[in-house]
C-alpha cells in the first residue's frame, strides 16, 4: 500500500525531504523506492517513526526508521539534529540483538518501542517469548522509565518485573504506559494531573503498577489523561 503524509512540517516530520507544509495527503516514496514494507507507524508532537520489513530486493535494512524534530534525541540516532527523511535507528543496546519490533508509541518528545524474541516456554513464561521495552529522548519528567530524569539520545531498556510480558504500550505528552500479559498496567513519567493513575500528582521515573483490582486489556493516552479497557476483577 501507499504511505501518505500530510499537514504541518516545520522540522522535517513529514519525511518528504523538505520543510514544506502539505494540506492534503502526499505519498511518502522513501520506503517504496527501497522496497521496504511499513507495518507499524507512530507519530509524536514533531517526530515520526515507522517499523519496516524488507521485501525481496530491498536496498536498505529493515527495522526502525525515525525522522522529524531531533531535539532531546527524539529520533534515537545518538544526536539531536532534525532529519527531513527517514533515518535507520542503529544505536540499540546489546540486549536488543535478535529482537523483532512488535509495537511503538511516541509522546510529545519521547519514544517507546516494544520488541520480542522467542525463548523456551517455562512456568514463569508460558508464552515462550521474551519482550523488552526501549525508550529514548526527553526524560525530564521520568517518562523514559530508566530511574533517571535525564534525556537519552539512544534507545535505553525500560525494566519491568521479570515475570511481566508487555503486551501493549502507549505515550501521552509526557507519560508512558504499558499493559502486560497478566493484565497489569504500569505507568511512569509526568503525574501532575493524575495521569498516571497512582493516586497522587507526583512524577515517576520508573514503571509503577496501577491499581491491582482490575485486569487491564488496553490503554491509550492523551496529552494529560489516560484511558483504559479493563475487567473489574482479576
Cite the ranges covered by each PLM segment.
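Eukaryote-biased RCC1-like beta-propeller repeat architecture
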Residues: 1-4, 8-234
